Amino acid sequence: MAEGDEAARGQQPHQGLWRRRRTSDPSAAVNHVSSTTSLGENYEDDDLVNSDEVMKKPCPVQIVLAHEDDHNFELDEEALEQILLQEHIRDLNIVVVSVAGAFRKGKSFLLDFMLRYMYNKDSQSWIGGNNEPLTGFTWRGGCERETTGIQVWNEVFVIDRPNGTKVAVLLMDTQGAFDSQSTIKDCATVFALSTMTSSVQVYNLSQNIQEDDLQHLQLFTEYGRLAMEEIYQKPFQTLMFLIRDWSYPYEHSYGLEGGKQFLEKRLQVKQNQHEELQNVRKHIHNCFSNLGCFLLPHPGLKVATNPSFDGRLKDIDEDFKRELRNLVPLLLAPENLVEKEISGSKVTCRDLVEYFKAYIKIYQGEELPHPKSMLQATAEANNLAAVAGARDTYCKSMEQVCGGDKPYIAPSDLERKHLDLKEVAIKQFRSVKKMGGDEFCRRYQDQLEAEIEETYANFIKHNDGKNIFYAARTPATLFAVMFAMYIISGLTGFIGLNSIAVLCNLVMGLALIFLCTWAYVKYSGEFREIGTVIDQIAETLWEQVLKPLGDNLMEENIRQSVTNSIKAGLTDQVSHHARLKTD
């Protein structure tokens, strides 16, 4: 950066605490790049340091924190604001270059060469000396993940464009996908969030572009597209496929031109392709305004196998260094910078802070569906198909029992048929070969049983509708209320209880209004909601008052009849014995 910019930055007040990570493991000091010159330190263990100290020394700052216990993400708003809201940059249009991809594929390693270029872009030897360790973003050899969440370099570079304007350049490092501690949702969230906030997303791949790489890209970009409210154009800007360890230079040469030819072949939509493969390629073309590809050779055996490798150029193959000198300026040279745009409008540093806040809230909420692995998605589809088939079998069989053209069936017979057919449907579900295991499939069997019970409840209502007495229950109930109120009104009026008589007349009038309204609703089909309310009131009166009263009266009549029969029988026996004695 220019000296004036550094002086202005040094004068900015910075308060509060930031998270940074410092290497405490002595053995890691060999693999990690230690602090040198202008590129700051490597950090590993979570520490809190004063932001004044952090701003005095360039270093990576974690702005999106990954919580492994609940697989959620948190934005460190204070850290992001203190980086992007510095007075000399906050109103500048921003360029965000992000590197994403699978874990342990050298994303942070690549970003550190980008840092070298940004600090020495005016020099032909920006790539550094042969014995100079690689510093900047934390990186190391090995098979365990290093970066979590999203980190940015805390020094925002102010660059003069060829057209005379100034832009701010921010470098972003992301958590590697598909490690042993991250879910598909974690990977999708990090990739989508970095793609949504970057102007250039470098998709870091190893050796080749495989079909699963494209499918994961489709899933992750769709997850990001869903989070953006209204999209009338391609939602994302530039995607650069970076193929590391390219082993086929005899087919496609290293660099941009070879990558362009290779990418065109990989993303070509062919008529004889399966529809699934065509859709993946169409989706990628529809999501990004610009697509590119760069083929990078293997850095050499010393880089891959030497545990003490610290990024010195003397240990890296010449082919790799040559192509690296072409790649980094392709992304970061002033004439090649891509300014961040959202919905066609340029984004400033100040704007990007607000977009980060808005996007992280979306991913912290439950509005978006949770992305799933291919196995889980296939197992779900497999089980749902089995549920649908078994439910369809149950419905068709029940239609034969009490369908629209079938007569009314006794409730006890209907329930017996239901239980038999439910068992048949469950057996059919179990007989289908399904993915996911017994515990996973059990949830879908429970879902099937619940759906069958819900369908059975509808069949009960349909069957009850065929019962003429059930259909006449509402008018009969209302008429019974009117008749009872008429009798009670007459009796209470006769004995002088006029207030009760008036109340009974009022209830009788309401019942008459309900009866007339119900008849109109059934005749015209209008005001069906009112008709439903009247049916519910009548149902409540029937179940809570009239039916219990009728049952009690019937029990009393039956009891009286039995008593009279017993008495009559005893009387007959006594009379018979008396006649025998007389004879």
Swiss-Prot record:
CDD domains documented for this protein: GBP
The membrane topology of this protein is: Multi-pass membrane protein
Q: Quick one: where's region N-terminal hypervariable region (HVR)? A: 1-60
User: Which molecular function GO terms apply here?
Assistant: GTP binding; GTPase activity; GTPase-dependent fusogenic activity
Sites where Phosphoserine occurs are at: S24
Q: Which example biological process does GO assign this protein?
A: protein homooligomerization
Q: What is the effect of changing S431A?
A: No effect on function in endoplasmic reticulum tubular network membrane organization
Residues that bind GTP, according to the entry?
R104, K105, G106, K107, S108, F109, R244, D245, V303
Report the residues modified as N6-methyllysine.
K270
Q: In which tissues is it expressed?
A: Expressed in peripheral tissues (at protein level).
State what changing R244Q does.
Answer: Alters endoplasmic reticulum morphogenesis
> Which ranges of this chain reside in the Cytoplasmic compartment per its record?
1-476, 521-583
Q: What is its main location?
A: endoplasmic reticulum
Lumenal face of the membrane: 498-499
Show the coiled coil region(s).
Answer: 256-284
Its family remark reads: Belongs to the TRAFAC class dynamin-like GTPase superfamily. GB1/RHD3 GTPase family. GB1 subfamily.
Which purpose does this protein serve, as stated in its record?
A: Atlastin-2 (ATL2) is a membrane-anchored GTPase that mediates the GTP-dependent fusion of endoplasmic reticulum (ER) membranes, maintaining the continuous ER network. It facilitates the formation of three-way junctions where ER tubules intersect. Two atlastin-2 on neighboring ER tubules bind GTP and form loose homodimers through the GB1/RHD3-type G domains and 3HB regions. Upon GTP hydrolysis, the 3HB regions tighten, pulling the membranes together to drive their fusion. After fusion, the homodimer disassembles upon release of inorganic phosphate (Pi).
Q: What is this protein called?
A: Atlastin-2
Q: What is this organism's lineage?
A: Eukaryota, Metazoa, Chordata, Craniata, Vertebrata
Q: What is the gene called? A: ATL2
